[in-house]
């Protein structure tokens, strides 16, 4: 167990090896100005500082705050609605209070004017009126770990929240903000 406080913070063991690009999504580099259906590979946006091969993140809401628009939330919950969520009387569900955030990561295949084509299809329908933004996605690429063996002594009987060993006493490898990596 490599946790500094194994009995107080059972889930909080430090990572032994971490491969991480330390920048976040930062500020928006453009706004999506036209609707795009789910499965499309092309969006319309005037972007700065990117070109073919660059990685970007389509963001609904902000990296800090979610979008609290009823239509946005209900589209994500469909066929359900946030208004139908049962909560204690007088309270509002967290999904309405905090809103939703969507982050889609894509690699740009080509840019022609304001038309941006990705190497893969988008996974959400884009409604231009909902405030979709494009952020640059800084990352490391082609990071890999091979021919590495971790050997330990597994507990005979797992008990959820039973001890620090049950709840994350070991975190061996963490990959954060990497692309085309293994």
Would you name each region that the model predicts?
Residues 1-182:
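Extracellular/periplasmic carbohydrate-active domains that bind, remodel
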């Amino acid at each position: 167990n490599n946790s500094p406080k194994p009995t107080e913070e059972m889930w909080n063991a430090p990572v032994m090896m971490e491969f991480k690009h330390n920048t976040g999504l930062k500020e928006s580099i453009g706004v999506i100005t036209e609707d795009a259906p789910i499965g499309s590979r092309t969006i319309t946006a005037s972007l700065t500082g990117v070109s073919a091969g660059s990685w970007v993140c389509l963001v609904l809401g902000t990296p800090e705050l979610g979008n609290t628009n009823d239509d946005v939330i209900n589209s994500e919950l469909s066929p359900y609605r946030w208004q139908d969520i049962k909560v204690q009387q007088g309270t509002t569900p967290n999904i309405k209070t905090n809103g939703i955030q969507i982050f889609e990561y894509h690699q740009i295949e080509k840019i022609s004017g304001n038309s941006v084509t990705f190497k893969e299809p988008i996974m959400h329908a884009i409604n231009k009126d909902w405030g979709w933004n494009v952020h640059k996605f800084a990352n490391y690429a082609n990071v890999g770990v091979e021919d590495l063996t971790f050997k330990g002594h597994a507990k005979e009987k797992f008990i959820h929240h039973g001890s620090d060993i049950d709840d994350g006493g070991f975190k061996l490898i963490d990959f954060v903000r990497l692309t085309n990596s293994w």
